[in-house]
Curated annotation (Swiss-Prot):
The keyword Transferase applies. The keyword Transferase applies. It comes from Exiguobacterium sibiricum (strain DSM 17290 / CCUG 55495 / CIP 109462 / JCM 13490 / 255-15). Gene3D superfamilies: Aminomethyltransferase beta-barrel domains, Aminomethyltransferase fragment, Probable tRNA modification gtpase trme, domain 1. Belongs to the GcvT family. It is an enzyme of class 2 (transferase). It comes from the Bacteria. Its EC number is 2.1.2.10. GO terms for cellular component: cytosol; glycine cleavage complex. GO terms for biological process: glycine decarboxylation via glycine cleavage system. The glycine cleavage system is composed of four proteins: P, T, L and H. This is Aminomethyltransferase. NCBIfam families: gcvT, PRK00389.1.
Length: 360
């Protein structure tokens, strides 16, 4: 895909001069500004911000909206209060994953679904198959910008820009109000393993918010650091830990899958995985030989390929070459493995996940 055909976020014009831009999910996005290590460390120790305006916003409303979402999503939507968010998975009939997403309950009959950039059109088409009754599904992805402000100093820095009492917004809750002079939705959530907020505002206002955050010394961060941060925290990335052939149960997301509570697309398969246990599961590995395992690298036991790496790198906080790997459940308690990297079999040992957990 040539650069001229790539989509651009509302922040492109102010980000492109200082960011190293790459093709990500059909968008021209910054992979880094200074370095992945510097940006990663800024989020772990202070505060950083990410342009995540490429994410999709699908609005669902109507008197049958709840029933529609209960049928199509994995979690129990009836448990979401107005002002609350919930992690969910959109599943295939066979239990494979269409996408993972956040659901915000905006009002009694109004919901916002925030989906992965690479899956916006696919998710919308999948959901439309099940539309019935009084439900309106609107794709308003182009109308909104999204900036994620993440790190232990996020509350302190953002509080200077808003009259909203940010400490009162608990994890996976949100408020609507003015921040940096812009009306927006302020969600206490994120994808880094740190405290932080995801800010949703009209596209036309995104640049003003970004500039206000720059003036407050928030460090601009690219998708490279976003990936190493989420990986250390063992948060799944669609196309890696979740896919059409990897179920949310296999990926360790069973907390968001409620087939015992309700029937939904894929629930017949997933209830069996919950009751009997999945045939595969994700484990953490650390390479004890020198090297870095990347996605799809074969994982071996006793010389036999039994699984594959979903994500692998040498992330800044951990400082060791680690990986997540999908292996048959019967091998998940093995202590030693090999990972094939560039034709060489490198020794690895199983380690606990998540690799990083922030101190409260």
């Amino acid at each position: 895909m040539s650069q001229t055909t790539l989509k651009r976020t509302p922040l492109f014009d102010i980000i492109a001069p200082t960011g190293k831009m790459v093709d990500f999910a059909g968008f021209e996005m910054p992979v880094l500004f200074s370095s992945i290590k510097e940006e990663h460390t800024a989020v772990r120790e202070r505060v950083g911000m990410f342009d995540v305006s490429h994410m999709g916003e699908l609005f669902v409303s109507g008197s049958d909206a709840l029933a529609f979402l209960q049928q199509t999503l994995s979690n129990d939507i009836s448990k979401i209060a107005i002002g609350q968010a919930q992690y969910n998975v959109l599943c295939q009939e066979d239990g494979g994953t269409v996408d993972d997403l956040l659901v915000y309950r905006l009002d009694e009959q109004d919901y916002l679904l925030v989906v992965n950039a690479s899956n916006i059109e696919k998710d919308e088409a999948h959901l439309r198959q099940y539309l019935t009754g009084d439900v309106l599904l609107e794709n308003q992805s182009d109308a909104y910008g999204q900036i994620a402000v993440q790190g232990p100093k996020a509350v302190e820095v953002l509080q200077e820009l808003t009259a909203l009492k940010l400490e009162d917004i608990k994890f996976f809750r949100f408020a609507q109000g003015e921040l940096a002079g812009v009306e927006m939705l302020v969600s206490r959530s994120g994808y880094t393993g740190e405290d932080g907020f995801e800010l949703y505002m009209p596209s036309a206002d995104a640049s003003a918010v970004w500039n206000a955050l720059l003036e407050a010394d928030v460090v601009p961060c690219g998708l490279g650091a976003r990936d190493t941060l989420r990986f250390e925290a063992c948060l799944p990335l669609y196309g890696h830990e979740l896919s059409a052939t990897i179920s949310p149960i296999e990926a360790g997301m069973g907390f968001a899958v409620k087939p015992q509570v309700k029937s939904f697309v894929g629930s017949e398969v997933l209830v069996k995985q919950k009751e009997d246990g999945p045939r595969r599961q994700l484990i953490g590995l650390e390479l004890t030989d020198k090297g870095i395992a990347r996605q799809d690298a074969p994982v071996l036991v006793n010389g036999e390929t039994i699984g594959f790496v979903t994500t692998g790198t040498l992330p800044p906080t951990i400082g060791k070459a680690i990986a997540l790997a999908l292996v048959p459940t019967e091998y998940a308690t093995e202590e030693t493995f090999e990972i094939e990297v560039r034709g060489k079999k490198l020794a690895a040992k199983r380690i606990d996940t998540p690799f990083y957990r922030r101190s409260k």
